[in-house]
Curated annotation (Swiss-Prot):
Function (record text): Accelerates the intermembrane transfer of various glycolipids. Catalyzes the transfer of various glycosphingolipids between membranes but does not catalyze the transfer of phospholipids. May be involved in the intracellular translocation of glucosylceramides.
Organism in which the protein naturally occurs: Xenopus laevis
BP terms from Gene Ontology: ceramide transport; intermembrane lipid transfer
Keywords, sorted A to Z: Cytoplasm, Lipid transport, Repeat, Transport
Localization per Swiss-Prot or TrEMBL: Cytoplasm
2 X 12 AA approximate tandem repeats: annotated span: 45-66
Domain of life: Eukaryota
Family to which this protein belongs: Belongs to the GLTP family.
UniProt: beta-D-galactosyl-(1->4)-beta-D-glucosyl-(1<->1)-N-[(9Z)-octadecenoyl]-sphing-4-enine binding residues: D48, I49, T50, G51, N52, I53, T54, K55, H140, Y207
InterPro entries according to UniProt: GLTP_sf, Glycolipid_transfer_prot_dom
Bridged cysteine pairs (disulfide): none
Protein name per Swiss-Prot or TrEMBL: Glycolipid transfer protein B
This protein's GO CC annotations: cytosol; membrane
Length: 209
């Protein structure tokens, strides 16, 4: 579970402001999560997440004080870009990034909740499908959706996935699930706060990639 627990997300303060530097430090290690799915077919999602992290980091590093929190980035870019906002800058990058992060969150939550295909209990195809349907499907065109259906054929066995999360170490499933639940606490709170922020600022867009 080293892929997740070595870089846990920090608890949010009462006002739910998300420190940009801390967020970027934690999220920058998540692209490796897709290597645990065992197929290069998932690489487009990994590449998308990596690219959006780079865009957000570039904006943050241009003025760390002005963009101390993710909320400050959206507010600053709203003023900067005017009518082009929110389809611009780090605001657009974070919009897509949060969807990729949501995919990870739903997938891990589904596994930790014990959801499975009774006919193939050691496959995580049902968990990946749920995560994709909730987090990404509505924002993908027909071609991308078909590509994802192909990717499902390469979905790993749960045992192999959990072992990959633990960087090849043999660990009991119960221990892995408990560590996933621990990781999800602050991670889920952070993702939810970003979604709420986008809704409050009317920054959410529903166009398809």
């Amino acid at each position: 579970m080293a892929v997740l627990l070595l870089h846990q997300f920090k608890a949010l303060p009462a006002d739910k402001q998300i420190d940009t530097c801390s967020f970027l430090d934690s999220v920058s290690h998540l692209p490796a999560f897709f290597d645990c799915l065992g197929s290069a077919i998932f690489s487009p999602i990994k590449a998308d997440i990596t690219g959006n992290i780079t865009k957000i980091r570039s904006v943050y590093e241009s003025n760390p004080t002005q963009f101390k929190t993710l909320q400050m980035i959206l507010e600053g870019e709203k003023e900067l870009y005017g009518p082009k906002w929110p389809k611009a800058g780090a605001t657009l990058a974070l919009m897509w990034l949060k969807r990729g992060l949501k995919f990870i969150q739903v997938l891990l939550q589904s596994i930790s909740d014990g959801e499975r295909d009774d006919q193939n209990p050691n496959l995580i195809k049902v968990n990946i499908t749920k995560a994709y349907d909730i987090a990404l499907k509505n924002y993908h065109g027909w071609l991308v959706q078909k590509f994802f259906q192909t990717a499902l054929i390469a979905a790993p066995y749960k045992d192999d996935f959990l072992k990959a999360l633990s960087k090849g170490q043999a660990v009991k499933e119960e221990e892995c699930i408990e560590k996933i639940r621990k990781f999800l606490v602050n991670y889920t709170t952070t993702i939810e706060a970003i979604y709420i922020m986008y809704n409050k600022m009317n920054a959410e867009l529903d166009y398809k990639a």
